[in-house]
């Protein structure tokens, strides 16, 4: 098959991870497209060249919520797998001898436990948190279909922060698990490098984590401003705890908190 004149297609090439999915590009040169061929379900361009949005943009974002929910589960599962590999290795791998001249499994060393046990607990916490957030998102999507957007922003922030936190935890935790396995962890046969390659793109796709963390920060500061101005009724349910912060003037002075410029 050959493309038509003026049409260029190609593959973007190898990536760090997500190799099972092919990503390509499409380029048009000196081609006129009729407006009827733009597949414009949610947008259209008028005869004057103006972009017109159809429907509520929030409904479009609700589709992204489903992908971010999947990323929460994938992150929890990935960290759990990495921890399981590292713990099993630590129980079998022996290093140095005790007073009885018996080699000691490295899981007996305090440093190994210090690095792995919190990750084990975190993986279970991530799974339970994922289930709770999934229920919240599903309920919000039901409300959105009914034209109710009361809880939409709060759900968006909750999911954005969770996506950034979970994907960062999964990748950083898998690196620690690899290090806990020494040279064996670096080998592809350990399984951990493959996990890391799979989840590495998750910190970027569906919202780069730094941007998502900043969105959460802005949301918190906005609610802090409401509290400072006495507009308690506008404070998000998830931010009620911030009222305790403003009960302590000393704490405010310590951190030099200024919420007056937050939009």
Where do the protein language model's features map onto the residues?
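Flavin-dependent oxidoreductase catalytic core characteristic
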Residues: 1-263
